[in-house]
Amino acid sequence: MNAETTDGKRVSIIGAKRSGIAAALLLQQRGATVYVSDREPVGDAERAFLEHHGIAFEEEGHTDRILEADFSVVSPGIPPHASVIRRLEHEAIPLFSEIEAASWFCPAFIIGITGTDGKTTTSSMVEAICLSGANSREQRVFSAGNIGVPFSSLVGEMRKGDIAVVELSSYQLERCRSFRPDVAVITNIMPDHLDRYGGSMKRYAEAKYRIYAQQRKQDTLVYNADDETLRAHFEGGGAFVPQLVPFSLDRKRASLGGACYAAIEGDWLITVVNGREEKVITGSGLFKRSFRGRHNLENALAAVAATRAAGVDVFPIREALRRFAGVEHRQEYVRTMHGVDWINDSKATNLNALRQALDATPGKLVLIAGGRDKGDDLSDLEERVRQKVSVLVVFGESKAKFTEAFSSVVRVVPALSLEEAVEQAQRYASTGETVLFSPGCSSFDMFESFEERGMRFKKHVEGMQS
């Protein structure tokens, strides 16, 4: 399927959330007859949008009308084993993701970014760098994908010569068949979402690897050489079509990838392009109170490698990194009260992100953790909790699991709500410590999203009397 072959086609869109209705409008504008179907009630805003644009839809179930289609676009939140997917597959109806469908109409240079952790921060840095390095007033930079605006909502505005920075989850990549970023980035691969992949890390990683499946020799693939899974995959002797550009905190390790890489040399973040070294920025120039830690060095390396591959010069990269202050809900500084710093890391929805937050936070801390359990093994955190955490405040569905795992190494205080957790943390935190809200779990037990969870945390912290 491509931009030339959608005109006159019948398309069923499965899922009436943001990406689904964005794909529906795009395909309708490109000549397709579109039908949207959702098993849940359609929201008021989505209903008004669909009715305004004359897009037919159904709700609270999928009728056989979805089978009257030449192909279907499936929203990322619908798992591969869902009954509606089985029905479509039984009728041999081709299934695509919203990202795939949008890419058919994209004339811009695409930088695609995926990984378990660091996607949003890296995407935000890449966007900032590209804006800093835009080579003319006519060149525009668009940011789309996993967390922000759907790709389908923006491709109609893009022109040749623009840059599209697209953040991609494994869910979005699963049904990509021809999507081909000019530069692809994989930040890391750690256990996450394994319930969707039958507990298989291999299947999860394979979904991530679809980001480069259609790349050509002139394209670039940036990967984290410090990640064991990625290092084994890309440095295990296999043949890969795009140019590989590794990044690493260890220059020697990065240099094994060839003539192009990004690494740390002393206090400097450097790139090497065709054997020529370029000093970009020092760690002291990069780090701020709201942006610190080993993982953010890795994110910066990924962003630098990607934007150099896209042709951005070193000077605008340096200037953009100096100004970059981090991303909301990712180790975000909220306030200091009575000598205690309060940090919002609501985006830590898995244990690796929690581990990174513990490593990045200086000194002793009171940790607020909990939420919906993803089946992760908490024992990996025991030594870090012993060394770093003075009091652990737990809430949400997983509080019993956290209590069982850590009550022998640290004082554990249960809370019935996030607000109570904040109040307990204030009670136990001492001057000079940090209160770190880094749940290590998904938000769906009590909140619609990690963003809502983070906003609730910040609102309560900002409202406390000093």
UniProtKB/Swiss-Prot annotation:
Gene Ontology terms describing biological process: cell division; cell wall organization; peptidoglycan biosynthetic process; regulation of cell shape
Function (record text): Cell wall formation. Catalyzes the addition of glutamate to the nucleotide precursor UDP-N-acetylmuramoyl-L-alanine (UMA).
UniProt EC number: 6.3.2.9
SUPFAM superfamilies membership: MurCD N-terminal domain, MurD-like peptide ligases, catalytic domain, MurD-like peptide ligases, peptide-binding domain
Reaction equations catalysed: UDP-N-acetyl-alpha-D-muramoyl-L-alanine + D-glutamate + ATP = UDP-N-acetyl-alpha-D-muramoyl-L-alanyl-D-glutamate + ADP + phosphate + H(+)
Principal subcellular localisation of the protein: cytoplasm
InterPro entries to which the protein is assigned, alphabetical: Mur-like_cat_sf (IPR036565), Mur_ligase_C (IPR004101), Mur_ligase_C_dom_sf (IPR036615), Mur_ligase_cen (IPR013221), MurD (IPR005762)
Enzyme class: ligase
Binding residues annotated for ATP, in chain numbering: G115, T116, D117, G118, K119, T120, T121
Cellular component aspect of the GO annotation: cytoplasm
Top-level taxon: Bacteria
Pfam families given in the database record: Mur_ligase_C, Mur_ligase_M, MurD_N
Protein name, entry field: UDP-N-acetylmuramoylalanine--D-glutamate ligase
One GO MF term: UDP-N-acetylmuramoylalanine-D-glutamate ligase activity
Keywords on record: ATP-binding, Cell cycle, Cell division, Cell shape, Cell wall biogenesis/degradation, Cytoplasm, Ligase, Nucleotide-binding, Peptidoglycan synthesis
Pathway(s) it belongs to: Cell wall biogenesis; peptidoglycan biosynthesis
Subcellular location: Cytoplasm
Family of this protein: Belongs to the MurCDEF family.
